[in-house]
């Protein structure tokens, strides 16, 4: 219950703009760009440099895939719903700097396949 209250109580994620994400990628800043869609969606096209971790596996696999809880993470999905859930989950697991880009539909650049 404490995790649930903590996660949703302080759980409003800060939304990253397209320009902010583009600048971070261009400067090659040290952060994780986390795609929380399905493997099939990821294969159809993803933002370059993204790491795939489906949102329904975040709780089970975050520790092994994202060992540094201080490293900034920017999360995205298709529309923004799953990324918001994943951001709250990651914060509840102790990740300190989690931001939400929302949906890949906001991305105006090229996609990798």
Show where each model-derived region lies.
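Rhodanese-like catalytic fold shared by cysteine-dependent sulfurtransferases
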Residues: 1-24, 31, 39-72, 78-113
């Amino acid at each position: 219950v404490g995790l649930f209250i903590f996660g949703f109580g302080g759980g409003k994620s800060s939304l990253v703009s397209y320009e902010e994400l583009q600048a971070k990628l261009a400067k090659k800043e040290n952060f994780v760009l986390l795609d929380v869609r399905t493997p099939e969606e990821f294969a159809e096209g993803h933002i370059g440099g993204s790491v795939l971790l489906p949102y329904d596996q975040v709780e089970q696999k975050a520790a092994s895939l994202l060992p540094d809880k201080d490293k900034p993470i920017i999360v995205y999905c298709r529309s923004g719903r799953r990324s918001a859930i994943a951001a709250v989950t990651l914060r509840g697991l102790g990740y300190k700097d989690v931001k939400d880009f929302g949906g890949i539909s906001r991305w105006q650049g090229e996609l990798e396949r």
